[in-house]
Curated annotation (Swiss-Prot):
Residues 358-381 are annotated as: Disordered. It comes from Drosophila pseudoobscura pseudoobscura (Fruit fly). The modification N6-(retinylidene)lysine is found at K326. This is Opsin Rh2. It is found in: Membrane. Disulfide bonds join C130-C207.
Length: 381
């Protein structure tokens, strides 16, 4: 597709009439480049803004390409290692595998489309691909957050409940994954059948749910969607980690107090080494989840700006929010690759050049010496 296929500036005036010149003062608008088949989907609000600087489009395109490569390579390796290694296919790791697969699909379905549109400085793939792009973003984003929610619950069950908890089996893990995907599909298809819709946003290089239309239909969807796909998982994750942190802190305090009474520095047995390993995994999961919310919260705020008619929403703001949200798919393979000893061992066997640092496993059958501190034991886990 050549740039000559892009529409001429009068299209924006034809679409909005006198209001175009009133809002732009005769200057160019982001609607100047919009294709005719996309024009009916564009909210008139965006007509007041000038096109984004071509240099910024190139920067965004390059940034998107970089995170695409990092994410697809990282998540692809995680899927390969966890999926192809029998010893790593535990119930808990199936949730990690599901998360990595979702993140991989997120970037594979979103980033190439964004890069194409950054090149043309508008959406050039038509209404159908607008729906597909936005639906994929919604689907895989929902799967990712609920996968993290289930990971948090698994850590809660292991660390807080301990022997009183019900161990997660392969069957239970598969049922949880099936639930995650069914719920994600439900929220994804709603805008396709009439509850809200998928439309171009900001500088018209990406599509998302309609958060600008002042009608109850799209507003009710956004409120309900954010309740079930953002706030509910956030509450459940915070609940899980509140008790995880409290349990770990109480355990460590009891260990220190008892060690003082016995005039030693550590009381860790082989069982406690396993406990420390579980605590380490909980810290990894908490870090991953925190990074995910740091990536997606700005975009939620952008949607709420449109929902509640708050001034200050610009095309550049929306596209940076949408682009930054994609970085959530980059964090997980990095965090797990650095912090999961068994993952690192298998990765070293299959791809030695991909591993940096030591891959020594903890030795739970030999308890730490009396001179070994609690923090040292935890670092080995």
């Amino acid at each position: 597709m050549e740039r000559s296929l892009l529409p001429e500036p009068p299209l924006a005036m034809a679409l909005l009439g006198p209001r175009f010149e009133a809002q732009t003062g005769g200057n160019r608008s982001v609607l100047d480049n919009v294709l005719p088949d996309m024009a009916p989907l564009v909210n008139p609000y965006w007509s007041r803004f000038a096109p984004m600087d071509p240099t910024m489009s190139k920067i965004l395109g390059l940034f998107t390409l970089v995170i695409l490569i990092i994410s697809c390579c990282g998540n692809g390796v995680v899927v390969y290692i966890f999926g192809g290694t029998k010893s790593l296919r535990t119930p808990a790791n199936l949730l990690v595998l599901n998360l990595a697969f979702s993140d991989f699909c997120m970037m594979a379905s979103q980033s190439p489309v964004m890069i194409i549109n950054f090149y043309y400085e508008t959406w050039v793939l038509g209404p159908l691909w607008c729906d597909i792009y936005a639906a994929c973003g919604s689907l895989f984003g929902c799967v990712s957050i609920w996968s993290m929610c289930m990971i948090a619950f698994d850590r809660y069950n292991v660390i807080v409940k301990g022997i009183n908890g019900t161990p997660m089996t392969i069957k239970t893990s598969i049922m949880k994954i099936a639930f995650i995907w069914m719920m994600a599909v439900f929220w994804t298809i709603m805008p396709l059948i009439g509850w809200s819709s998928y439309v171009p946003e900001g500088n018209l290089t990406a599509c998302s749910i309609d958060y600008m239309t002042r009608q109850w239909n799209p507003r009710s969807y956004l409120i309900t969607y954010s309740l079930f796909v953002y706030y509910t998982p956030l509450f459940m994750i915070c609940y899980s980690y509140w008790f995880i942190i409290a349990t770990v802190a109480a355990h460590e305090k009891a260990m220190r107090d008892q060690a003082k009474k016995m005039n030693v520095k550590s009381l860790r047995s082989s069982e406690d080494c396993d406990k420390s390993a579980e605590n380490k995994l909980a810290k990894v999961a908490l870090t991953t989840i925190s990074l995910w919310f740091m990536a997606w919260t700005p975009y939620l705020i952008i949607c709420y700006f449109g929902l509640f008619k708050i001034d200050g929403l610009t095309p550049l703001t929306t596209i940076w929010g949408a682009t930054f949200a994609k970085t959530s798919a980059v964090y997980n393979p990095i965090v797990y690759g650095i912090s999961h000893p068994k993952y690192r061992l298998v990765l070293k066997e299959k791809c030695p050049m991909c591993v940096c640092g030591s891959t020594d496993e903890p030795k739970p059958d030999a308890p730490p010496s009396d001179t070994e501190t609690t923090s040292e034991a935890e670092s080995k886990a």
